Amino acid sequence: MKSQNKYSIRKFSVGASSILIATLLFLSGGQAQAAEKQVNMGNSQEDTVTAQSIGDQQTRENANYQRENGVDEQQHTENLTKNLHNDKTISEENHRKTDDLNKDQLKDDKNSSLNNKNIQRDTTKNNNANPSDVNQGLEQAINDGKQSKVASQQQSKEVDNSQDSNANNNLPSQSLTKEAPSLNKSDQTSQREIVNETEIEKVQPQQNNQANDKITNHNFNNEQEVKPQKDEKTLSVSDLKNNQKSPVEPTKDNDKKNGLNLLKSSAVATLPNKGTKELTAKAKDDQTNKVAKQGQYKNQDPIVLVHGFNGFTDDINPSVLAHYWGGNKMNIRQDLEENGYKAYEASISAFGSNYDRAVELYYYIKGGRVDYGAAHAAKYGHERYGKTYEGIYKDWKPGQKVHLVGHSMGGQTIRQLEELLRNGNREEIEYQKKHGGEISPLFKGNNDNMISSITTLGTPHNGTHASDLAGNEALVRQIVFDIGKMFGNKNSRVDFGLAQWGLKQKPNESYIDYVKRVKQSNLWKSKDNGFYDLTREGATDLNRKTSLNPNIVYKTYTGEATHKALNSDRQKADLNMFFPFVITGNLIGKATEKEWRENDGLVSVISSQHPFNQAYTNATDKIQKGIWQVTPTKHDWDHVDFVGQDSSDTVRTREELQDFWHHLADDLVKTEKVTDTKQA
């Protein structure tokens, strides 16, 4: 008979626990975890079946602990009933369901009473779990286990008597009294063993302000580490509600620390929480989106737009000048960004030499204080150091490339920079060896594979007659430099890029002293400026010092805005040519060399197509490296039509300008397939 009773009790325990686990897994979305323990107590008739309120099976050690300490099962039943009833009070929105299931819940209090011994003050933190879900699970477990109860009549009578007694109790709902019994060393050891055998699960509420609190449910028997206490503490229902809605108080922080200490000492593994996994997955997705932001651009290598002679960015330009890249028609850089191309506008000297501008362009991209070089500064008589750039691509190094697009003189500047990166500056290297000191990494060379492509728009690769016949005249230089001197005062935002020559008033310097100092500058007699570099002599010197890089894609775009005169072979400016260029266009149109006459107002077609001493070919759909790919000449396009500065020109429309730049940018993206060293 005893064997049969033991079998029935075991069957009831396994059946009830299995159903309870399935129910809680279904209702809590996989957040509740259960553990099953079998209880074999020999011939004792006081063996009871423990049904966990959160889904955990009570262990045999806990039953021994309860029996050894002479726990009054009836009193534990009443205390647990009070706690469950208080759960119902806190969850008012589930009040109706709890009332219907309350009686069935009381029937199982006999089996669950052993859990109440270790209930602590922080039990209220776990009341965020829906009590109706727990009651429903217990109800199903009890109903399915009734058949097993019949097998043990004596056990059933004890359970029925306890249920009848509990059903008639008048349960208080205004306060919850909790006791913390003192424990001796053996009790503490037993309690520690119980905690080790009990699984921990985390419950995350889904709605309201409860979502802000992460609740750790240790099942009622291991809610908090049990410590000897002398006083009883009574919590009202209103206090429980306030604790749920208010921010965490220092006392709660202490409780949490105690719980963490218990977990640490017990070495209990915390089971994965589904809700936490979902939040972590979402966070990873968000992070992925953030990282992918750079990947949204069509171009892997950023595009850097390099302005030409007398070019400015909007923050330092004279107010009479239009926006360089797009004029009043459009903002080219911004339009490229909006259409998926990463692009920048370089800010370098407007009237400096190609060498000085190339050094500035390097630091504009890389970042840092401009170092023109000790040897160069000593040779031409200007300051060695210039302005400091923040840098748009601080990680710019071999393998990390950029596309360089230069308009007018900007194309020459780009070529000079590429030469310095690849081969360095022999004069600077020798000077540093002789005199010591620092040397810029730019002048050391061996910095290949930092440029993906070089594209030039109306660049005077071979110089221009406009500079030979007018631009480089002493009178013209004097006028321009005087204007630069005037704008160099300390109250002006305009920057001509000639500070290395002293054309910038110092903070504590009077304007009179500034003018006197500028008169002594070597700028007035130097060739280290843009006026000279744009002459055919200066351009030829640059061509001798530079070479083609076999790893770079080169391409040129050329415009033409003149036509043949009726009675001669001279070229005359078109009616729609940018008005300031009419004079220079006609001047170039009557040059001695007939092949130089066709021009865009400033630059001859023959000079814009390619350097005379370097290889070239007609551009096709096939992308080639290490050779100038010359695109067909764009007729009726003057020098500024490539950048849209002529707002009065009705022939060249905004849509046409936009299409040109979109095609150019798309072409740059295609070149990355043949210049990407990572794929090669």
From Swiss-Prot:
Listed Polar residues bias regions: 125-138, 162-193, 204-223, 235-246
Sorted UniProt keywords: Calcium, Hydrolase, Lipid degradation, Lipid metabolism, Metal-binding, Secreted, Signal, Zymogen
This protein's GO CC annotations: extracellular region
Signal peptide: 1-34
Catalytic residue list: 408, 600, 639
Class in the EC hierarchy, top level: hydrolase
GO MF, one annotated term: metal ion binding
GO biological process assignments: lipid catabolic process
Subcellular localization, as worded in the UniProt entry: Secreted
Record Pfam families: Lip_C, YSIRK_signal
SUPFAM superfamilies: alpha/beta-Hydrolases
Residue ranges of the region described as Disordered: 82-259
Residue span(s) of the pro-peptide: 35-290
Protein name, entry field: Lipase 1
UniProt-listed Enzyme Commission number(s): 3.1.1.3
